């Protein structure tokens, strides 16, 4: 996948993270990324076709793999390969028949209303009940896992998810339960059930964080996988960006990012910048405030700049570390090209650009009291008339409210039209590209302070911010941080004791 063919943007190919991310995904999760790259035409189509074949040739999707092989060889068929695919297909169908027969009796019992009413919270009691009344042993329960794995390799992700649900309800095998949780998470992603995927993400995170690993490298690998797999639901669920910030800023996972996958800082940056709507909300946890997240993000990007950087992270560095507005503008233009060819971020491209322009405006206005309309409009890549109207609307609440209502109505109309024209909404690629099919909105920037027009200039009214208030703001989270540190130390001591025993 190294060669380039029809790339409309060499920049997009240079900063493409697909290959880095694929190293930490299950083969079935890799496939949507390959499909996305095929649609974007940023790589050699034949190499992508070969990658799909190599990816799926060991699965049970024999018919699809046979089609890939035929397309890979220019539509020509080979008798030996055709016989090999036919033999594998017969083998798969035979195994399917055997497993269905073996599992049918178990599923009939597990779906029995009388059994469901008799179940308890304790798995041991449930297994004993199954063995005494239905002659279902732990070995027979394990067949559910085997059949789920078979269905998953056939591409029947919904069926695999249901089987894994029943398996986890009765299995006491910790290793198989852990594997089943990973499989359930992947199945929910591939069936585009984002609510279910978020629920499984929580279970998986709890399992990875609470489990005592003898080898710290194994725990690091598990957290690395979790971070990469989580990109699917977190950038598709309604509350995904906020949850992503909580997960990625959590110290163990932040350490994982800095140690093994610094490229994930791109996704953390986009999540923080696009989550500015919650900036004025007061969270129960001070560490979750937008201002705190932005400060932490700037610090982390500065620390990891030697290890990884791209236009997205460079924009934050240029704006807050270097205070170079020209460089920030240049990075912002590059961000658009990079984000529109990123599988996970294509739908957030416009939201990120809008949020980034707001940050650029606020940073520029923070160090000025009087700004030329033309200069600020140039910084934000807006028309002067647009900027003047924006400032006037912000100073007139009634006009602003009417403008917002009209914008909301327009967005709703576009959404309805988009829904009617996109019939297939359950495909990962379709969801990733929904935003790019809609007409790009006009850039909008909301100032975090008062601004008024004075001829061809904008007068910035900076709020008074006393030294006492600064001290209060900087120390009000110390109590929470101390408590969090105490809990972390207690957990570390407990883990050391268990490891010693």
UniProtKB/Swiss-Prot annotation:
Which locations, inside or outside the cell, does it occupy? Cytoplasm
- Give any single GO term for biological process: formation of cytoplasmic translation initiation complex
Gene inactivation phenotype reads:
Slow growth, reduced polysome content and reduced translational initiation in minimal medium. Mislocalization of proteasome subunits to the cytoplasm and impaired proteasome assembly, leading to the accumulation of polyubiquitinated proteins including cut2 and cdc13. Impaired mitosis and spore formation. Enhanced sensitivity to 3-aminotriazole (3AT), caffeine and thiabendazole.
User: What is the recorded function of this protein according to its Swiss-Prot or TrEMBL entry?
Assistant: Component of the eukaryotic translation initiation factor 3 (eIF-3) complex, which is involved in protein synthesis of a specialized repertoire of mRNAs and, together with other initiation factors, stimulates binding of mRNA and methionyl-tRNAi to the 40S ribosome. The eIF-3 complex specifically targets and initiates translation of a subset of mRNAs involved in cell proliferation (Potential). Required for maintaining the basal level of atf1 and for transcriptional activation of core environmental stress response genes (CESR genes) in response to histidine starvation.
Q: How does it assemble?
A: Component of the eukaryotic translation initiation factor 3 (eIF-3) complex. The eIF-3 complex appears to include tif32/eif3a, SPAC25G10.08/eif3b, tif33/eif3c, SPBC4C3.07/eif3f, tif35/eif3g and sum1/eif3i. This set of common subunits may also associate exclusively with either moe1/eif3d and int6/eif3e, or with SPAC821.05/eif3h and SPAC1751.03/eif3m. The eIF-3 complex may also include SPAC3A12.13c/eif3j. Also interacts with the proteasome via rpn501/rpn502.
- Judging by the UniProt lineage, the source's domain of life is Eukaryota
- Drop me one GO molecular function for this one: translation initiation factor activity
What is the native source organism of this protein? Schizosaccharomyces pombe (strain 972 / ATCC 24843) (Fission yeast)
CC annotations in GO: cytoplasm; cytosol; eukaryotic 43S preinitiation complex; eukaryotic 48S preinitiation complex; eukaryotic translation initiation factor 3 complex; eukaryotic translation initiation factor 3 complex, eIF3e; nucleus
| PANTHER family (alphabetical) | EUKARYOTIC TRANSLATION INITIATION FACTOR 3 SUBUNIT E
* InterPro entries for the chain: eIF3e (IPR016650), eIF3e_N (IPR019010), PCI_dom (IPR000717)
What this protein is called in its record is Eukaryotic translation initiation factor 3 subunit E
What's this protein's family per the entry? Belongs to the eIF-3 subunit E family.
Q: Does the keyword Cell inner membrane apply?
A: no
Q: Which Pfam family, an example, fits this chain?
A: eIF3_N
**Which parts of the sequence carry Phosphoserine?**
477, 479
Chief location bin: cytoplasm
Q: What keywords appear on the UniProt entry?
A: Cytoplasm, Initiation factor, Phosphoprotein, Protein biosynthesis, Stress response
Domain PCI residues, every copy: 245-423
Q: Does the keyword Lyase apply?
A: no
